[in-house]
């Protein structure tokens, strides 16, 4: 007699439990943001989008080796910056402190999300030793968002600035900070102890796109951070950066530029957004070089002391030359 009893199907493998301490990239990171990413037909890159590779005679491998030896991260690597070959090749890097896991999930950014590790007490000294070993005259120090810290990480920035100045007194320091949302007054009071040579905080995009591109951030708050810092340190240059190609209009970018000047921001960067992966926000437009040129001309008319504007410009790209152009170094 035939046995008609159904054979049980193999058990489905249990879904892996969500691990908040793991570094999430691409889909794992963006899947949990409130506004879902809707894919669109991928635009063909125009001929003016060109990345410079490191040359065989460059310092690319030397820089990577030194960074690993000192257990340091760079935003160049973590955010998949297209200029990494050129910058590492010239012996420059933007150091990313406080770990490689961000508490935010911005869907334009390739830095990983997750519950951050405790701060590394040795990081300020390791950073300073690395900068001294590389003989860098201008450095940019940035960080992941650390919403888990009472001061947003401001105290760690100060420790890093102090250590770098101790070991490399002639080196100029630019910091590119998170927004310190919910702890701004505390963070600014702490930064008073060791202000940088340039204070940079990026608005990133126009206010209409904040909910989509910068969940957890606030346009007015970011402007207030820049203005309040400048009020405390009128002799320190302030700086901010924007991406284009996310669906903003020309008029919206010009209005953001006016807002920045109204909040006493001195320096400006504008560059083309490039999608890190198919799970990030799509590129909706490749902005023409003529439009970048117009933004640059308008920036100087508005009174910015320096404007770095172009498709491949990033906030820290040639930051030393930007600072020199603004009279900082």
Swiss-Prot record:
Pathway connected to this protein: Protein modification; protein lipoylation via endogenous pathway; protein N(6)-(lipoyl)lysine from octanoyl-[acyl-carrier-protein]: step 2/2
Compartments where located: Cytoplasm
Family, similarity comment: Belongs to the radical SAM superfamily. Lipoyl synthase family.
Record keywords, A-Z: 4Fe-4S, Cytoplasm, Iron, Iron-sulfur, Metal-binding, S-adenosyl-L-methionine, Transferase
CDD domains given in the database record: Radical_SAM
Enzyme class, spelled out: transferase
Keyword Metal-binding annotated: yes
Record's cofactor remark: Binds 2 [4Fe-4S] clusters per subunit. One cluster is coordinated with 3 cysteines and an exchangeable S-adenosyl-L-methionine.
GO CC entries: cytoplasm
InterPro entries to which the protein is assigned, alphabetical: Aldolase_TIM, Elp3/MiaA/NifB-like_rSAM, LIAS_N, Lipoyl_synth, rSAM
Domain named Radical SAM core: residues: 87-305
Cofactor: [4Fe-4S] cluster
Keyword Kinase: no
UniProt cross-references to Pfam families, sorted A to Z: LIAS_N, Radical_SAM
Species in which this protein is naturally found: Burkholderia mallei (strain ATCC 23344)
Annotated region (Disordered), positions in chain: 1-23
Gene Ontology terms for molecular function: 4 iron, 4 sulfur cluster binding; lipoate synthase activity; metal ion binding
EC assignment: 2.8.1.8
Catalyzed reactions per annotation: [[Fe-S] cluster scaffold protein carrying a second [4Fe-4S](2+) cluster] + N(6)-octanoyl-L-lysyl-[protein] + 2 oxidized [2Fe-2S]-[ferredoxin] + 2 S-adenosyl-L-methionine + 4 H(+) = [[Fe-S] cluster scaffold protein] + N(6)-[(R)-dihydrolipoyl]-L-lysyl-[protein] + 4 Fe(3+) + 2 hydrogen sulfide + 2 5'-deoxyadenosine + 2 L-methionine + 2 reduced [2Fe-2S]-[ferredoxin]
Gene name in the database record: lipA
Binding locations of [4Fe-4S] cluster 1: 76, 81, 87, 316
UniProt name for this protein: Lipoyl synthase
Binding site for [4Fe-4S] cluster 2: 102, 106, 109
């Amino acid at each position: 007699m035939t046995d008609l009893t159904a054979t049980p199907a193999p058990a489905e493998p249990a879904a892996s439990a969500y691990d908040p301490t793991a570094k999430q990239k691409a889909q794992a990171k963006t899947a949990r943001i409130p506004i879902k990413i809707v894919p669109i037909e991928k635009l063909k890159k125009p001929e003016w989008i060109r990345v410079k590779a490191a040359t065989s005679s460059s310092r690319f491998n030397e820089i990577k080796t030194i960074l690993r030896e000192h257990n340091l991260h760079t935003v160049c690597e973590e955010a998949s910056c297209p200029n990494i070959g050129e910058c590492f090749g010239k012996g420059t890097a933007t150091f990313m402190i406080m770990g490689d896991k961000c508490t935010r999930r911005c869907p334009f950014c390739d830095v990983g999300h997750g519950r951050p590790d405790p701060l590394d007490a040795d990081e300020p000294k390791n950073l300073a030793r690395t900068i001294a070993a590389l003989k860098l005259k201008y450095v940019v120090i940035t960080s992941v968002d650390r919403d888990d810290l009472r001061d947003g990480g401001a105290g760690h920035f100060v420790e890093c600035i102090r250590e770098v100045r101790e070991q490399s007194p002639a080196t100029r320091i630019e910091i590119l900070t998170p927004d310190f949302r919910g702890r701004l007054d505390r963070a600014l009071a702490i930064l008073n102890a060791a202000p940088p040579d340039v204070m940079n905080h990026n608005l990133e995009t126009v206010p209409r796109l904040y909910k989509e591109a910068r969940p957890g951030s606030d346009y007015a708050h970011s402007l207030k951070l820049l203005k309040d810092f400048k009020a405390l340190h009128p002799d320190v240059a302030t700086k901010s950066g924007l991406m284009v190609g996310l669906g903003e209009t020309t008029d919206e970018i010009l209005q953001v530029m006016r807002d920045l000047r109204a909040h006493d921001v001195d320096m400006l960067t504008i560059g083309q957004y490039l999608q890190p992966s198919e799970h990030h926000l799509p590129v909706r437009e490749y902005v023409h070089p003529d439009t970048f040129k117009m933004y640059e001309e308008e920036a100087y008319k508005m009174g910015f002391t320096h404007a770095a504007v172009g498709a491949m410009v990033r906030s820290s790209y040639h930051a030393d030359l930007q600072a020199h152009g603004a009279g900082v170094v």
